Amino acid sequence: MAESLPILNQPRRHERFDAARELETRLRTTLRGPNHDKVRFDATSRALYTTDSSNYRQIPIGVVVPDDADDVIAAVAACRSLGAPILARGGGTSLAGQTCNAAVVFDFSKHMRRLHSLDPDARVATVEPGIVLDRVREAAELHNLTFAPDPATHSRCTLGGMIGNNSCGTHALMGGKTVDNIRSLEVLLYDGTRLSVGATSDDEFRAILHRGGRVAQLYQGMRQLIDRHADEIRRRFPRIPRRVSGYNLDELLPENGFHVARALVGSEGTLATVLSATLDLVHSPPCRRLVVLGFPDAFVAADAVPAILEHHPIGLEGIDSTLLENMHRKHLAEAERKMLPAGNAFLLVEFGASTDAEVDAIAYAFRAAARSIPHALEANIFAGEDAARIWRVRESALGATVFVPGKPHLWEGWEDAAVPPARLGEYLRSLFALMREYGYHSPLYGHYGQGCVHMRMNFDFESEAGLRAYRSFIDRAADLVVSLGGSISGEHGDGQSRAALLPKMFGAELMQAFREFKRLWDPDNRMNPGKLISAEDEIYQPTENLRVGPGYHAAQPETHFSFDRDHGSFGEATLRCVGVGACRKTDSGSMCPSYMATREEQHSTRGRAHLLWEMLQGNLLDRDWSNEGVKHALDLCLSCKACKSECPVSVDMASWKAEFLAHYHQQHPHELRHYLFGFMDRWAHLAAAVPGLSQRLANLPLQIPPISATIKSILGIAPQRNLPRFAPRTFQQQWRAQNATQAANLPQALLWPDTWNNYYHPQSLTAASQILHTAGYAVQVPRQHVCCGRPLYDFGFLDTARNYLRRILTEFAPQIDSGLPFLFLEPSCASVLRNELLDFFPRDDRARRLADQTLLLSQFLTRHAPHYEPAQHPDTRIVLHGHCHHKAVFNMEDELAWLRRTGATVELLDAGCCGMAGPFGFEREHYSVSQTLGERVLLPAVRAAAPADILVTDGFSCREQIAQNTPRRAMHFAEVLCPPQPTSTP
């Protein structure tokens, strides 16, 4: 290795491209049509694509977001005219650095995601490269078919990316890698040649040569290359289930049908651009069982793999106790982990069949046979939702290896080597001995059934000594893998992490063959240059282009929040995002609503995190809190906090947005509506000054259309929206008027009169007070005006927000110190005291106690009044929508359980965010996105509900979205549980 290692982001000579402005002009001239945002060369757009899920960072020349194949062809021609390198990109979740480069990035994921056809009889589907895997699988499952490879990123990885990477996943054991499931490809070469490739018979080969031209030259060159190197390919290519390293030259061997499409799979965009793909589908067993075996350690679990494979499972995965310990520290899959059998390492063995009886027989026979497997401790069988929950433990693995509290950062860099399954135990023992030499450690998880185990290690990339140790380690680890007949990459590809190690695995002759193959397809070396294979052998080394390298220092700006879990550094917090892209899923969960609506990288949690990191580093983007590009990206963040729970590394973009806006508005004045919405508690309190009268006066302008329209216009409120009207009397006013006496010997709870339920929906608080009384509690209701300050965060009023919380800590000190439960009905208000309170006061004992004592009604009943008898709703269907903060900061299980105790059938919608999100949905510029999100699941479900169905949601914003878009009224959980009561409350 060189004496002086390349330093972070040091550009190479061939990266220099001086015609970016001219290229942008040519692309804009060429790519016309209804979408006007196909060409993006601004700094913000480029910053979004500087990295993927790897350790690497390179600044692209620009970004193209094509509508269709014609756009791709035209854009490549424009790039070719100026010699600009290009890089095709799908979901951007690659782990080896193959989807970041100093090139023009083509993002296929926004528009080119069509499923052109699916023929269940022929078991084939034709798709565009940007389609997400889960969409293909969902369509195929209607016919009991599937696309076999299913990486853990299946909810957001694209088929184009899978083809480029040769992706695998759990069920590659059942149906093979991506390369084994490609029928044909339509591809575009850098020189403009467009062709369809697949298996090639002798007659087809002769016909191609007869036609002549570039395609004939290409095929003739490939045939000659194979004729020269066939014997060496047969000798050196490992015969294992998981060889992903190198080019798939073995697919061009005569015995494999000279399959050109499959030879291109795994080429990481270095040879051609995929325009469409025809996929082979396989039978998907409709009935499945999961058998989980416990072992004393991961090594003996690996030893058991050959014996288990004799039973022909369709999936065989492994996890170890270190991974589970990390999950415990991060509070991941807590209930699911308790379902595992005894042991310190576990194998997840899945079987499939056509009927339940058949698969049960297979699973129970295997469990009986497993008693004879050495060191197997216990075996549990799971089906249905229980099996799905166990699989979620496995799919949480990557998130459990990064940013683990109390542990050093773990990085990719040696995370997916594969060996013959029979030698997996030997490999792991030898590898861990090598790791101990270097002081490295890692959890283990992955595809044990195919000899591929994933890990992330505590590499030191921030010093040259650390880099030298890293390079020495991977050199020796590669030697170990090769000695066992394995592959340096068994799933994630070579990219930049492993490209320099390929000569160890393939030898000089095959490396020359790879370079010849590269020159045949890309003689000008313009396709993802420097990654995997270079025609001139100028590949990037694993120690170049590191996002965090020697001399790196996390930015340390002064902030309002403490960022305590990130050592007090906002800069380190923004490094949390490791690019796995869970925020880019579109069909389930709540994260990330703005991405679901726009499919724009800048509107994903990942995109925003990367922009904030770039801004704080001050390299590509100015280190300036006034950065309009960053503000624009944050503008569509609904502050739903879904990322806090659904992001594998717990990015809290709502808090990051509030922090940014606090600094931004130190230099830019607030808008008038910021004061209206942000300080809504004060306006509501003022409107209630004279009970009954002042509320009517405050509502009056909203009832006169010309005045209401003028107010909306001035404040930038969407004309389609109706501003909520104040209730005639607040809950506090009603409570004080009753002047009720409560027994002194009863346990007490403090019922928080939040702004929304107090001033707008007092009936919810009334119902809650009645529930508490019936449950045997004396109710404390603050007499003074109180507010958690939730709306202040939406506009960056963080100094004021801190003061609100400090006031609560002071004024309610006796109740906090006595351990009194603080009961909230509005999830977004409760989340302030669970979340932001500790972000401001992380070491304040009283703040910690208040956070622990803050409960939603359902939680309170579960903890303190489990014998409460709710109102009964037999033969009724309840449609439940969870507020985003309820799901992110608390959970829905308690509420579900209590609603079921009413005798009703309860359906919890997987609707994500309702789209209203406090003031967001009222703002004119956000109305369209708000409606798109509402219409995704929630509003259609409300309209489809029967008149007798009860609609339940605890969020004021959610109820407003329903009320303003349907004729239905949603109820608060408290209203549903509260039995009919007399009008007065004791």
Task: Map each language-model feature to its residues.
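N-terminal glycine-rich flavin-associated loop
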Residues: S54-I86, V104, F108-P151, I163, ...
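Ferredoxin-type iron-sulfur electron-transfer modules and their immediate structural context
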Residues: F403, P408-L410, S483-I488, G495-L636, ...
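Iron-sulfur cluster-binding electron-transfer modules in prokaryotic oxidoreductases
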Residues: D522, P529, A654-P986
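A glycine-rich phosphate-binding loop feature that marks nucleotide/adenosyl-phosphate handling sites
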Residues: S94-G97, T153-G160, P241-N248, L252, ...
